[in-house]
C-alpha cells in the first residue's frame, strides 16, 4: 500500500529496491530515438535530415514556437530517419532516429572542470544562450526556461536564482 500525505504526494516504498544492487555501466545503444516533444508546448522542428552525421551536442531540432525548446543529440552517429514513434503516453510523436557510431562530441562544448562563476553578458544574450541550449525545467512539464525568463516589459527582475538540482530526490540519489 502506498503511503500518502495530507499535503499531497505519493511516496512509493519501491524507490529503494535497488539500494543493494551494484551500479553498472550501461552499454551505448546501436540505435537512438530522440523525441522532438520532450517539453511542454510545440514539438521542436528538425534541422537535420536523413544521412546527416551528428555528434553529441549537435543541435538536431529548433524551437517551433515561443513555448518550445531546442533539442541536441545525446549520441554521435548518422541520422537514419525522421519519423513518428509511439511514446509512453501511447500517442505517436515525431522523433529523430540515429544509428549510433562512436562517441564524438561537438568541439564547441566546454567540457573543462572550471566553473564560470560570474557572467557579464546582457540579459537578452543570456536568455538567447539558454534558448539555444534547449534548457527546460525538470519539474514534470519540462517547461522551456527561456519562456520563464521573458516576463512582460512592465516586470523587472533584479536577479535570477537558478536551482540546478534534480527535484525528485529519490531519482537523484543512489
Kindly give the residue locations of the regions a language model identified.
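Conserved small/polar residues in nucleotide/adenosyl-binding loops
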Residues: 172-174
Amino acid at each position: 500500500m502506498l503511503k500518502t500525505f495530507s499535503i499531497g504526494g505519493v511516496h512509493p516504498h519501491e524507490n529503494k529496491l535497488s539500494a543493494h544492487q551494484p551500479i553498472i555501466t550501461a552499454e551505448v545503444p546501436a540505435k537512438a530515438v530522440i523525441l522532438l516533444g520532450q517539453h511542454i508546448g510545440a514539438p521542436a522542428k528538425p534541422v537535420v535530415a536523413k544521412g546527416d552525421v551528428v555528434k553529441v551536442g549537435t543541435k538536431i531540432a529548433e524551437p517551433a514556437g515561443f513555448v518550445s525548446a531546442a533539442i541536441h543529440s545525446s549520441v554521435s552517429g548518422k541520422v537514419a530517419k525522421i519519423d513518428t514513434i509511439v511514446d509512453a503516453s501511447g500517442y505517436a510523436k515525431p522523433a529523430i532516429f540515429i544509428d549510433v557510431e562512436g562517441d564524438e562530441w561537438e568541439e564547441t562544448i566546454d567540457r573543462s572542470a572550471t566553473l564560470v562563476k560570474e557572467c557579464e553578458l546582457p540579459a537578452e544574450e543570456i536568455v538567447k544562450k539558454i534558448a539555444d541550449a534547449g534548457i527546460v525545467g525538470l519539474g514534470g512539464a519540462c517547461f522551456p526556461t527561456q519562456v520563464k525568463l521573458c516576463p512582460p516589459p512592465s516586470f523587472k527582475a533584479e536577479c535570477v536564482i537558478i536551482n540546478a538540482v534534480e527535484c525528485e530526490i529519490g531519482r537523484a540519489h543512489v
